[in-house]
């Protein structure tokens, strides 16, 4: 565990080499969507369906509460900005409506490319976490037991090498996404 407020921990060797390659291959088949972000269904293949179930068990939240996987490519030159995945109830209430699953409670992140390392920086915590291929970082976006965003959950993610890196993110909502 790296932090208790917000809860941040890393699970080593969670994704197999085959699972990492499957995410990359399916994203490549989808083609370019939003510059370098590919939205991948939880059941895009039998292997990813099983991976989705394992991730759901890891965070003890139904996979039906999760948004689609975001598989992203970037390199050392990619300009990244500070991100907070939780939704602000005052300004983003439409995104929190019943059908959209409510608040974004958990974010899972991982490096997919062989020999890649991703660095996740939490500026509010003065914390840098380097993720290796197959590792999963789990971040609780809200205060414990609430849907109020924790401002300390802001992060920046970047590649630590010059080649194209593949990165995975999965966000779990508070309720079923319809």
Sequence positions of predicted segments:
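Fe(II)/2-oxoglutarate oxygenase catalytic core
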Residues: 1-137, 142-178
């Amino acid at each position: 565990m790296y932090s208790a407020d917000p809860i941040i921990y890393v699970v080593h060797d969670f994704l197999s080499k085959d699972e990492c390659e499957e995410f990359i291959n399916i994203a490549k088949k989808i083609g370019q969507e939003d510059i370098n972000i590919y939205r991948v269904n939880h059941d895009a293949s039998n292997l990813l369906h099983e991976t989705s179930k394992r991730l759901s068990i890891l965070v003890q939240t139904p996979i039906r509460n999760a948004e689609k996987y975001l598989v992203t490519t970037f390199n050392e030159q990619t300009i990244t900005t500070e991100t907070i995945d939780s939704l602000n109830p005052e300004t983003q209430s439409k995104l929190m409506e019943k059908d959209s699953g409510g608040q974004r409670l958990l974010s899972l992140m991982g490096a997919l490319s062989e020999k890649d390392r991703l660095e996740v920086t939490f500026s509010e915590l003065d914390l840098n976490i380097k993720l290796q291929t197959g590792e999963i970082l789990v971040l609780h976006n809200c205060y414990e037991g609430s849907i109020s965003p924790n401002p300390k959950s802001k992060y920046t993610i970047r590649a630590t090498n010059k080649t194209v890196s593949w990165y995975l993110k999965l966000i779990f909502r508070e309720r079923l996404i319809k």
